[in-house]
Amino acid sequence: MRKHTERTPRHRTLLLPRPLAAAALGGALVLTGLAEPSWSATAGAAAYPGQGPCPPGDYQLCINGGPGGFTIRGRTFSGHDNAILLRNVSDVTITGNTFKNLSGRTGYAGVHVKNSSGIVIRKNKFTKLRNAGHMHGVYLVNTTGSTIAGNTFSSITGDPVRIRDGSRNNSVTGNTFTRSGTYAIFSEWRDHRKGESCGSANTIKNNKYGPGYRGTPLPLIRWGGRGSGKTGPDKLTWKTCKTPTITNRGGNTRL
């Protein structure tokens, strides 16, 4: 893990070429009429419930609170440090999107989720997410009951799926991972200096995975990570929780 330095965020407006319409689909609110976004230099109207200004870190789309229950579908996110940030929200589905060419010193992940639940990340493509700090494909922080299924991950410097700070009951199922990861395909880490806790009951099954980002084999899972240094009292160490926080449910095969 690495430390991030804050910098002044760039303020943007999402310009919509036509009005939005809302349609019910399977009990969820799906926003239609969305074209590819065009960003300007000032804040503007939100396209999704709970959408608002982004914190420092160069995100493209930020949701903080709101009713949830909607879908982000069929978009392409590229050319920034990060793509989507979800905070304090439930029951959001992210499906059929492409996350590519994300890079920068404040890059955390393609999809960064905090303090949320019931997030579904399904049938997306994550490719060329790379920086010196090992950014991830999906990064769940204090997040529960979420599903990562049927996605493809390739050329990602950090672990393609990383969970943190008490994340529990999350599943990683039926994904394909190639040339991605520094420590594992699915890893858990916490900042014990901030009082963050171990997760629990996270699972992985029926995935296909190849070597890590540098072309060498990686373990499928690593859990109970803490620390970030190479030596000394802050040395990165695994299996520091009392019980495993991620369980291999089987059916995972190497490519």
Question: Can you name each region flagged by the protein language model?
Answer:
Residues W223-P233:
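Surface-exposed intrinsically disordered loops and tails
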Residues Q60-C62, A83-I84, G110, M135-G137, ...:
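Structural detector of coil-to-beta-strand junctions
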Residues P49, G68-G79, S90-S103, S117-R130, ...:
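Right-handed parallel beta-helix
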Residues Q60, D81, R190-G195:
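Short, recurring structural edge motifs at helix starts
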Residues G52-P55:
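The feature captures the LRR N-terminal capping module
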Residues A41-Y48:
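Low-complexity, acidic Ser/Thr/Pro-rich repeat tracts that form intrinsically disordered stalk/linker regions
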Residues R2-A41:
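Secretory targeting and sorting signals
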Residues I63-N64, L86, V113, L140, ...:
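Extracellular beta-strand solenoids
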